């Protein structure tokens, strides 16, 4: 490579040894250069990237430091027409021990004249009353793996029934256990399976609520209604609670569960706590609803089955035979 600086027809050659050679005096005023293979340089014209042209020059040096940088051309990759579509993840399976428990309960109910969907109301009511109410989620998983509950609409109807059973159980077992249960279930709910209905949005503690609650109370207690309420003559807050809240707000609502569904909440939740008097009253009340003695025995045995599953002994509750004379 050479550089030249014309001065009085003197040319200074910069040799390949990186030193300036002695000046040459030339008669030719035009600069000369040492022949050497020319390097290729590209002079990018200062235009937009779309119209920019590139020309081949043989200039030995061209300063392009202040030229704009070419715009970055983003490359987009088209999705393959054979791309695998997104698939719904498989439904989780319940614990095998619980699956066996639920199989036993549903099999026993199938031997009765009771509607087949009543068994899981008993199941959720006994589990929420147990030492481990969060395992209501196992019942939900078991059910949604069954063919009748494979669609979002069927699962929405299912969760309405399970949720109402848990809500009714609040007045039997307290509020904390049902809250733990519904939170555990909600972890497995898919968005399309959720139900946003609000059954008690417009509830009022009014005369209609009082009449509805008292009517349901009298249906179960019949001739024993007055005598039972008289237990609370010296504790009238409890009498008010029974009529306005227990039976008015909670147990007489028929927006989701029917009469028999409600008894499949109340009797199992009470009996699971090994409560003598209330178990007697609600074995009797279930018989008064028209459930035959043999079917009530199956209900009693299923409650004992769930209690035994958790290692709970129900030794204070009466048998169905012991209550029969009071029906």
Task: Give residue ranges: language-model regions.
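Acidic, glycine/proline-rich low-complexity segments that act as flexible tails and inter-domain linkers
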Residues: 2-3, 7, 75-258, 293, ...
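Short, low-complexity intrinsically disordered segments
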Residues: 16-18, 38, 117, 201, ...
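Alpha-helical oligomerization segments
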Residues: 258-271, 275-327
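Detector for Asparagine
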Residues: 27-28, 43, 56, 66-69, ...
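N-terminal mitochondrial targeting presequence
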Residues: 1-79
């Amino acid at each position: 490579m050479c550089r030249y600086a014309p001065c009085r027809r003197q040319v200074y050659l910069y040799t390949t040894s990186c030193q300036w050679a002695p000046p040459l005096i030339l008669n030719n005023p035009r600069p000369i250069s040492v022949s050497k293979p020319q390097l290729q340089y590209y002079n990018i014209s200062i235009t937009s990237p779309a119209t920019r042209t590139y020309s081949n020059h043989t200039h030995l040096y061209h300063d392009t430091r202040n030229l704009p940088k070419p715009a970055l051309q983003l490359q987009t990759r088209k999705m393959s027409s054979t791309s695998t579509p997104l698939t719904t993840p498989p439904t989780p399976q319940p614990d095998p021990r619980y699956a066996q428990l639920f199989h036993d309960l549903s099999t026993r109910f199938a031997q009765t004249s009771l509607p087949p969907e009543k068994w899981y109301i008993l199941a959720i009511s006994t589990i929420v009353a147990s030492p481990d109410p969060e395992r209501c989620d196992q019942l939900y998983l078991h059910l949604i793996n069954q063919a009748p509950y494979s669609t979002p609409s069927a699962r929405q109807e299912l969760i309405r029934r399970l949720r109402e059973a848990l809500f009714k159980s609040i007045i039997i077992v307290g509020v904390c256990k049902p809250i733990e249960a519904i939170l555990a279930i909600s972890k497995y709910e898919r968005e399309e399976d959720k139900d946003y209905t609000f059954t008690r949005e417009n509830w009022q503690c009014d005369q209609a609520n009082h009449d509805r609650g008292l009517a349901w109370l009298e249906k179960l207690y019949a001739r024993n209604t007055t005598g039972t309420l008289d237990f609370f003559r010296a504790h009238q807050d409890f009498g008010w609670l029974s009529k306005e809240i227990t039976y008015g707000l909670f147990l007489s609502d028929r927006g989701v569960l029917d009469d028999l569904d409600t008894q499949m909440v109340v009797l199992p939740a009470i009996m699971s706590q090994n409560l003598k008097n209330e178990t007697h009253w609600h074995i009797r009340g279930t018989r008064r609803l028209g459930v035959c003695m043999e079917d009530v025995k199956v209900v009693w045995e299923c409650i004992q089955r769930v209690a035994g599953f958790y290692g709970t002994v129900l030794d204070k509750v009466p048998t169905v035979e012991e209550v029969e004379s009071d029906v």
